[in-house]
Amino acid sequence: MGPTTNNLHAEVMSPGDFDLLSGFISSRCGIKLPPAKKTMLEGRLRKRLRSLGLDNFAAYCDYLFSQGGLEDEGVHMVDMVTTNKTDFFREPQHFHFLTQKALPELTQKLGWGSREKRLKVWSAGCATGEEPYTLAMFLREFGGASADFHFSILATDISTRALEKARLAIYEHEAIEPVPLPWRKKYLLRSKDKDKNLIRIAPELRSLVHFRTLNFMDDNYRIREPQEIIFCRNVLIYFNRPTQLAVLKRLCRHLRPGGYLFIGHSETLHGLDLPLGQCAPTIYRKT
C-alpha cells in the first residue's frame, strides 16, 4: 500500500539523505544545493515518493542507488530539481544587440546566413522553449521575405520533461504577452477550443528549431559544427565557479572565432580565463 499524503507531508529528509541526494544532483547535473535548500528538495521529491509508493526519503535513496535505480529514476530526479523558469523576449536588450549588431556583423561582413554558410544558433539550457522560439522570430524577421537567409537553431536542455513541452510548443496565453501583436498574428496560433486560453507556435517556426537532450556536465557535447551564436542565459548561476569555468570552456570549444556568447544579466565572467572579449554587458565575442 502506498503512503498517505499526511505521512508524506510529515516525513522529513534526514541530513544524511540530503547529503546523498545533493551529491548525486551535483555530480549528475552540476547544480549545487546548500543545506538551506533541503526543504525545497523535500517538496519537489514528495511527488516522486507518491508515484513510487515509497514511505520515506531513506527508501527513495535506497531505490535511487540500487542496481538499475539510477538508470530508471535519474531522469525523473533531474526533472524534479531543475528550474525551467523562462519567458518569451526575456532580457530584451540581448535581442536588440542581436539584430542591431551581431547579425549585421556576422551576415554582411562575414557572409554567414548564405546557403553555403548557414548561420548556426544554439540555445543552451532552453528549458520549455520560449528562448529558441523567440530567437526564431527575430531571425525570421531579420531575414525578412528573403529566401536567401539560411539559419538553424539548436535548442538543448537536460530536462526531458521541459523538452517535451518545448517540442509541443503550447503555452498559456499570458506567456505570449511580451510578443508584439504583429508577430503574434504571424507566428502564433490560437486554440480552436475557446474555453482553453492556449496558443501554439506556428509550424513554420517550430520547423526551424531542433531540440535535443544535453547535459552540461558531459565532456563531449556531440555538436559537430561550430556555432556562430550561443545563448546560455541564467544557467551558470546554478553552478559553482569551477563548474562554471569548465562549462564555459566547453561552450567556447563550440563557438566559432568571431561568434557571440550571451549570458544572463545576473551572471559574470569576471576573472575567468577564457578566449572571450566583452562587447556589451553580458555579451561576449570569441577572439
Regions found by a protein language model. Give the residues of each.
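Conserved beta-strand signature within the Rossmann-like core of class I S-adenosyl-L-methionine
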Residues: 258-265
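Core SAM-dependent methyltransferase catalytic element
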Residues: 229, 270-287
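Extended basic-aromatic, gly/pro-enriched interface segments that bind polyanionic ligands
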Residues: 124, 145-231, 235-243, 268-270
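Conserved AdoMet
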Residues: 2-120, 264
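Conserved SAM-binding loop of SAM-dependent methyltransferases across substrates and taxa
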Residues: 128-146
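Conserved class I S-adenosyl-L-methionine
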Residues: 116-129, 154
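A short glycine-rich, Lys/Arg-flanked "PGG" loop and its adjoining helix->strand segment in the class I
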Residues: 245-257
